UniProtKB/Swiss-Prot annotation:
Compartmental location: Cytoplasm
Annotated GO MF terms: adenine binding; adenine phosphoribosyltransferase activity; AMP binding
Family statement drawn from the similarity comment of this UniProt entry: Belongs to the purine/pyrimidine phosphoribosyltransferase family.
Reaction catalysed by this enzyme: AMP + diphosphate = 5-phospho-alpha-D-ribose 1-diphosphate + adenine
Known role: Catalyzes a salvage reaction resulting in the formation of AMP, that is energically less costly than de novo synthesis.
Name the record gives this protein: Adenine phosphoribosyltransferase
SUPFAM superfamilies documented for this protein: PRTase-like
Pathway(s) where this gene product acts: Purine metabolism; AMP biosynthesis via salvage pathway; AMP from adenine: step 1/1
Species of the source: Lactobacillus helveticus (strain DPC 4571)
EC number: 2.4.2.7
Complexes and interactors: Homodimer.
Predominant location category: cytoplasm
Top-level class of the enzyme under EC nomenclature: transferase
Protein's gene: apt
Amino acid sequence: MAIDFSKYIASVKDFPNKGIVFRDITPILQDGELYRIATHELAEYAKSRKADVIVGPEARGFIVGCPVATELGLGFVPARKPHKLPREVERASYDLEYGSNSLEMHKDAIKPGQRVVLCDDLMATAGTLRASKELIENLGGKLVGAAFYIELPDLKGREKLPDVDIYSLVQYHGA
């Protein structure tokens, strides 16, 4: 029986800024069985893409990606916000739905030729995904897929990266 994960995602209006509807995944995380099932679904997707490693952007990508990597017995690579990693890094900038930022990965985090699946909580404008893809490719890896709890199709993230296979548990159309 398929689970309708949208029943467990809280919608918070005007957070973090006026006009934004924040999709809060913490109700899923608070339910151990639901979290396990969501993780398993993303892990099955990553397995189908023959991933060698999982990348998760800071911060909720850690929460989503680490258990996927663990379930599959794969390594996990954090894509961190600037100045959080102690060794030499590669950096890429991106725009958010409500601002801009950069992501960094250690220069030795992705091995040449590795097949990478990115896991995160939400894809909106695909800015984080685009920056992560740039980092992965600059380090010699290949982004073979991206898995999200939530996708906001109206923001056309898929259209911005048509060469990336994208999987999501829930899609929210409109506000």
